[in-house]
Amino acid sequence: WIMGHMVNAIYQIDEFVNLGANSIETDVSFDDNANPEYTYHGIPCDCGRSCLKWENYNDFLKGLRSATTPGNSKYQSKLILVVFDLKTGSLYDNQASEAGKKLAKNLLKHYWNNGNNGGRAYIVLSIPDLNHYPLIKGFTDTLKQEGHPELLEKVGYDFSGNDAIGDVVKAYKKAGVSGHVWQSDGITNCLLRGLSRVKDAVANRDSGKGYINKVYYWTVDKRATTRDALDAGVDGVMTNYPDVIADVMNEAAYKNKVRLATYEDSPWVTFKK
């Protein structure tokens, strides 16, 4: 999965997919009442990027739905996965469950079209703080209460705080999650980070008794870092330059080892070599 980083304006969806991304990451900010409000990152953000692009969250969802609904004039068949980077740092811990409920209602209405031929992309809810694990239960309970438990097949989870893997597993157990787990590791492109935790996550994924289904690394903008990440066995790389990742995947060392994921590749099933 080539994951376009910080896609917060509707026009950027096409821009990143046309550069080679089959997945995007979108920031979600919340208001004081735990309502998802804007797709907005803010300052500071990655070096070389504008931090200030934004849409109203519901408008973005409608644009995303158009881009991921077969038959729509704006349909992009390659776009199969969306990571919502939930900026829950602005919320009190006791608002996490409420944020999950509201997120579920927004997605159900504006993205899934109340279960009636909505967008088809898989969704990953990425949460920066392990203490906000109740967001997951708020989300899953709400979809069930609204009569659409089947949509949970399209939803996965990620804790993005670079916490110890054991602590992440404990948070998932508390949230009642036993699958659909992506594990992120990384740092802004302005700084360097080693791959030791990525390798730990990959080992957990491949152990057969681990908790992790997929591993992605962020933010990867350079060819050398891309090669290191692919060599470490990641499933996804998040990038500001999807074309760079696509170029590396076409190099002789990789073109027979890795390929771009398609809609038929489940993002929840660990890939067996």
UniProtKB/Swiss-Prot annotation:
Write out the residues that bind Mg(2+). Answer: E25, D27, D85
The UniProt record lists the EC number as 4.6.1.-
The protein's name is Dermonecrotic toxin LhSicTox-alphaIA2bii
Instruction: List cofactor names only.
Output: Mg(2+)
Choose any GO biological process term that the UniProt entry carries and state it.
lipid catabolic process
Entry comment describing in which tissues the protein is expressed: Expressed by the venom gland.
Any GO molecular function: lyase activity
Name which cysteines form disulfide bonds: C45-C51, C47-C190
Keyword annotations of the record = Cytolysis, Dermonecrotic toxin, Disulfide bond, Hemolysis, Lipid degradation, Lipid metabolism, Lyase, Magnesium, Metal-binding, Secreted, Toxin
| Entries under Gene3D superfamilies matching the protein | Phosphatidylinositol (PI) phosphodiesterase
| Organism, scientific name | Loxosceles hirsuta
Pfam families associated with the record? GDPD_2
Catalysis performed (reactions)? an N-(acyl)-sphingosylphosphocholine = an N-(acyl)-sphingosyl-1,3-cyclic phosphate + choline; an N-(acyl)-sphingosylphosphoethanolamine = an N-(acyl)-sphingosyl-1,3-cyclic phosphate + ethanolamine; a 1-acyl-sn-glycero-3-phosphocholine = a 1-acyl-sn-glycero-2,3-cyclic phosphate + choline; a 1-acyl-sn-glycero-3-phosphoethanolamine = a 1-acyl-sn-glycero-2,3-cyclic phosphate + ethanolamine
Q: Name one GO cellular component term.
A: extracellular region
